[in-house]
Amino acid sequence: MSTNSRSNSRANFNNEIHDIGTAQNSSMPPTYYDRSLADIFPPHLLKKVVSEVVSTFLLVFVTCGAAGIYGSDKDRISQLGQSVAGGLIVTVMIYAVGHISGAHMNPAVTLAFAVFRHFPWIQVPFYWAAQFTGSICASFVLKAVLHPIAVLGTTTPTGPHWHSLVIEIIVTFNMMFVTLAVATDTRAVGELAGLAVGSAVCITSIFAGAVSGGSMNPARTLGPALASNLYTGLWIYFLGPVLGTLSGAWTYTYIRFEEAPSHKDMSQKLSSFKLRRLQSQSVAVDDDELDHIQV
């Protein structure tokens, strides 16, 4: 294409954009008007929501069930056993539903993914509702099957509240740092994502459990608190995980190597598991999309 013809094409393209914008009385790019309701609420959103309900239910059922039994009889389940159970259920759920919903199971994780543009904001309330629903249902099922155990794996501070807050921030930072690496970076080993995140949860909860309970998850705390009618230091387990996930995601985003890999490297590094998990995250439209249109 000659220089003159390219210039004319670009001018025509700009005129078309201007005409559309004038007709709609807005400077908003037409891309946003062309988006259908299905783009915002995809047909598979219900399946993703159900996936989050089920996975969060099982997460809370296993972790809080183990903690509840440990609290009533330390000879049946050890502190280490609780941590291993929590790490294993996270690993299993990531492999089971990671390709469907991303296996967030945690409102703070969903928030961090949305803030750093790995998840659409419009779907955040649906994920939060699913996660809290799964947690609350699991907690009341535990209340029924573990009766007369009254405290069902609630997370409460064992010392000053600020000690537990700092612990929750640090352990959740660790979990989110690892999660963002294995879930979004094509250079990370995707097939080991479940093991990496599950191990991070297990390792940090071994020592955090003795101080704060090692929640790392507002949903995991709220359900048992409601079922046990115990709300001591509840704010810690909302503020701490949110600060931890946001700081962990920001840190990995900052140090992430941004140079675009070659097609050959991409095919070698991007595992089938990671590809399916990334495809489950409907990434929001890039604000600079028009800059990449070829004319």
Swiss-Prot record:
The keyword Membrane applies. The chain crosses the membrane at residues 49-69, 83-103, 124-146, 164-184, 192-212, 230-250. Keywords: Membrane, Repeat, Transmembrane, Transmembrane helix, Transport. The keyword Transmembrane helix applies. A motif (NPA 2) lies at residues 217-219. GO terms for cellular component: membrane. GO terms for biological process: urea transport. Its main location: membrane. A motif (NPA 1) lies at residues 106-108. GO terms for molecular function: channel activity. InterPro entries: Aquaporin-like (IPR023271), Aquaporin_transptr (IPR034294), MIP (IPR000425), MIP_CS (IPR022357). It is found in: Membrane. It is a multi-pass membrane protein. It comes from the Eukaryota. Aquaporins facilitate the transport of water and small neutral solutes across cell membranes. Belongs to the MIP/aquaporin (TC 1.A.8) family. NIP (TC 1.A.8.12) subfamily. Aquaporins contain two tandem repeats each containing three membrane-spanning domains and a pore-forming loop with the signature motif Asn-Pro-Ala (NPA). This is Aquaporin NIP2-1. The lineage of its organism: Eukaryota, Viridiplantae, Streptophyta, Embryophyta, Tracheophyta. The gene is NIP2-1.
